[in-house]
Amino acid sequence: MSEPIRVEKIIPKGQGLAKAVIARALELKLPFEIRNKSRFSETLSDGREAHFFLPRGNVLVDGDILVADDGSMIKVSAANQQVVTIASNDAHQLMKAAYHLGNRHIPTQLGKGFLRIEPDSVLEVMIRQLGLEAIHELAPFEPETGAYGGGHRHSHAETFDSDYALAQKVYAEHEKPHVHGPGCSHHHHGDHDHPHEH
């Protein structure tokens, strides 16, 4: 049995490679959970074992090309997996759902007329409370890769109202009675005793 190959390099979407070269690459179908990792092992379509040591902070997307230490090229495909699709003709309702999912840093795929997330019973209740349908299906999952990087998840033990409750707590703490004066550390809008030049 041959030694496992080592894979360390990513060519995003195969940029700069000829179509003929990409066509010869081995295909590797991976679910999002694996595409979100930098260290993993998989058996390739030619039967060889491959160990992946990819740069941290990357999320593999459909069409990325990986290069092994022996020169082999591997084309990443998003595998079908269990997902929840939120579809609607009402763009405003979808935007509300996207807002709440984004507020919880939930990896979310944005499509024309739909959102897609990984199954989560608490989130599905929230989606239904917003008047949308949450449909379980098998489909590729390709969430947006945004400012939050790899898409960490918060615990959903907190309730649907947790964000609002936190905001109210911060507001209440800020509004506690306090003395304004030379030792006051924050800026106040409104009353001030210096003239403005016009």
Swiss-Prot record:
Primary location recorded for the protein, binned into one broad class: cytoplasm
Subcellular location: Cytoplasm
SS bond list: none
Region (Disordered): 176-198
Top-rank lineage group of the source organism: Bacteria
A Pfam cross-reference name: UreE_C
Keyword Amino-acid biosynthesis (UniProt): no
One example GO MF annotation: unfolded protein binding
A Gene Ontology BP annotation from the UniProt entry: protein folding
Entry keyword Chaperone: yes
GO cellular component, one term: cytoplasm
Keyword annotations: Chaperone, Cytoplasm, Nickel
Family stated for the protein in its record: Belongs to the UreE family.
Biological function: Involved in urease metallocenter assembly. Binds nickel. Probably functions as a nickel donor during metallocenter assembly.
UniProt protein name: Urease accessory protein UreE
Gene designation per UniProt: ureE
